[in-house]
Curated annotation (Swiss-Prot):
DNA-dependent RNA polymerase catalyzes the transcription of DNA into RNA using the four ribonucleoside triphosphates as substrates. The keyword Nucleotide-binding does not apply. It catalyses: RNA(n) + a ribonucleoside 5'-triphosphate = RNA(n+1) + diphosphate. This is DNA-directed RNA polymerase subunit alpha. InterPro entries: DNA-dir_RNA_pol_insert (IPR011262), DNA-dir_RNA_pol_RpoA/D/Rpb3 (IPR011263), DNA-dir_RpoA (IPR011773), RBP11-like (IPR036603), RNAP_asu_C (IPR011260), RNApol_insert_sf (IPR036643). Residues 1-239 are annotated as: Alpha N-terminal domain (alpha-NTD). The keyword Transmembrane helix does not apply. Homodimer. The RNAP catalytic core consists of 2 alpha, 1 beta, 1 beta' and 1 omega subunit. When a sigma factor is associated with the core the holoenzyme is formed, which can initiate transcription. One of its GO terms (molecular function) is DNA-directed RNA polymerase activity. Its EC number is 2.7.7.6. GO terms for biological process: DNA-templated transcription.
Length: 343
């Protein structure tokens, strides 16, 4: 048992943040600042660097893999009536941000006549594909010019170069495109000192995250943390020790185990706590047996203190004037120690 307790102290006695503080940016679907504090010294840098790398490289997203442009044989061509050459059009296509439900590959098409600009918003999509930056300009058409492009969209992670997006049986005219699947566009972090109580040398981790809108920054951090957790599991070579459960012992008690909690652990005012101490009321089991009249006879104990104690007991489902059979038990100190995690 002693060895188990020592092992558990390795992680149980480290300070941990209670929750993340998330501050949305101008567009909550794309920008946010996430703060975690307090962290043990050094953990800000450790977690910040690991989460940043995962956010940028390992989250699933959707992107264009290839494009077929009618009348174009390769990316070094030009199109009559289109001001941009095909190389520039391909560079613009790489910047299309997409959200797609389900697996790919899937198709989407744009067909337009000039004059005017062709934007990502002109793309005809199926129901489970959404173009997130419809104002992105793909090319410009002169009077009488026409263009038709068919895109192949797939899901993946990280960055995939065009060479890997070219299928072995690629038809003539299919132009593979570099794909940036990650829905996270930018991540930065900083680590500062923070205070916890009187201790000043804890870490505060602040992460600033920008996504393409396919995922919120808060969800992106959650997925990255889950990936890190899953990857680290293989390094844990032991089972989590099981604690004794109170249910196995409670049937042997003739009273509510909450009565074994000491009154000085209750959130009482100094005046009320001192009055209980002076009256030798140590455990809640001692307190609940007292009547209101008995409490008011306690020196320096007034109606305000009485109401405070009644409110605290009510929050625990208890009250003054209760009957507690079998109280106090002979081994009260030992029982209190065994049940301290269960009331």
């Amino acid at each position: 048992m002693g060895e188990t307790v020592t092992i558990q102290k390795n992680w149980q006695e480290l300070i941990r943040p209670n929750k993340l503080q998330v501050t949305p940016g101008s567009d909550a679907t794309r920008f946010a600042t996430v703060v975690a504090e307090p962290l043990e010294r050094g953990f800000g840098q450790t977690l910040g660097n690991a989460l940043r790398r995962i956010l940028l490289s390992s989250l699933q997203g959707a992107a264009v893999q290839s494009v077929h442009i009618d009348g174009v044989l390769h990316e070094f061509s030009s199109i009559a009536g289109v001001r941009e050459d095909v190389t520039d059009i391909v560079l613009n296509i790489k910047d299309i941000s997409i959200k797609m439900q389900g697996e790919g590959p899937k198709r989407m098409v744009v067909k337009k006549q000039g004059p005017g600009a062709v934007t990502a918003g002109d793309i005809q999509t199926v129901g489970d594909i959404v173009v997130l930056n419809p104002d992105l300009q793909l090319c410009t058409l002169d009077e009488g010019a026409e263009i038709r492009m068919e895109f192949t969209v797939a899901t993946g992670k990280g960055y995939v170069p065009a060479e890997r997006n070219r299928p072995e049986d690629a038809p003539i005219g299919l132009i593979p495109i570099d794909s940036l699947f990650s829905p996270v566009r930018k991540v930065s972090y900083k680590v500062e000192n923070t205070r916890e109580g009187q201790i000043l040398d804890y870490d505060k981790l602040t992460m600033t995250i920008e996504t393409n809108g396919a995922i919120s920054p808060e969800d992106a951090v959650a997925y990255a943390a889950r990936i890190l957790q899953d990857q680290l599991n293989v390094f844990v070579n032991f089972e989590e020790p099981r604690k004794e459960v109170a249910q196995e012992i409670i049937p042997d008690l003739a009273f509510n185990p909450a009565f074994l909690k000491k009154v000085d652990e209750l959130e009482l005012s100094v005046r009320s706590a001192n009055c209980l101490k002076n009256d030798n009321i140590v455990y809640i089991g001692d307190l609940v047996q007292k009547s209101e009249a008995e409490m008011l006879r306690t020196p320096n104990f007034g109606r305000k203190s009485l109401n405070e104690i009644k409110e605290v007991l009510a929050q625990m489902g208890l009250h003054l004037g209760m009957e507690v059979p079998g109280w106090p038990p002979e081994n009260i100190d030992e029982l209190a120690k065994r049940f301290e995690d269960h009331y």
